[in-house]
Amino acid sequence: MVKNQAQAKKSVKRKQLKNIPSGVVHVKATFNNTIVSITDPAGNVISWASAGKVGYSGSRKSSAFAATVAAQDAAKTAMNSGLKEVEVCLKGTGAGRESAVRALISAGLVVSVIRDETPVPHNGCRPRKRRRV
């Protein structure tokens, strides 16, 4: 009986809503998916969403519309914790780069800086084979 009460107390604990006025939005746009994670300036994740989490699967995950829906979902949950102003860090060359930024602005977040942090190899790994259609 004591174990059940201890477990009940653990499950009652919830995340406390913090009032975070500014943060950083990391958008990773690959050819297969788009992942949007919103952090505070220290790097602790406030909310995140991806095209797969929002409900798209297969080739629809790589669309620009799926990235828009994912960015709006992440922005909505972050704004509940008091987020107003964000910096945007873009990574990757997928279809959802610009549409994710537009969705953040339309959700009501103020975008102060947009940075492109796409990793560019200085002749590192061998690229995948070319498609022959």
UniProtKB/Swiss-Prot annotation:
It comes from the Bacteria. GO terms for cellular component: ribonucleoprotein complex; ribosome. PROSITE patterns: RIBOSOMAL_S11. InterPro entries: Ribosomal_uS11 (IPR001971), Ribosomal_uS11_bac-type (IPR019981), Ribosomal_uS11_CS (IPR018102), Ribosomal_uS11_sf (IPR036967). The keyword rRNA-binding applies. Pfam families: Ribosomal_S11. One of its GO terms (molecular function) is structural constituent of ribosome. Keywords: Ribonucleoprotein, Ribosomal protein, RNA-binding, rRNA-binding. GO terms for biological process: translation. PANTHER family: 40S RIBOSOMAL PROTEIN S14/30S RIBOSOMAL PROTEIN S11 (PTHR11759). Part of the 30S ribosomal subunit. Interacts with proteins S7 and S18. Binds to IF-3. Belongs to the universal ribosomal protein uS11 family. Located on the platform of the 30S subunit, it bridges several disparate RNA helices of the 16S rRNA. Forms part of the Shine-Dalgarno cleft in the 70S ribosome. This is Small ribosomal subunit protein uS11. It comes from Chlamydia pneumoniae. The gene is rpsK.
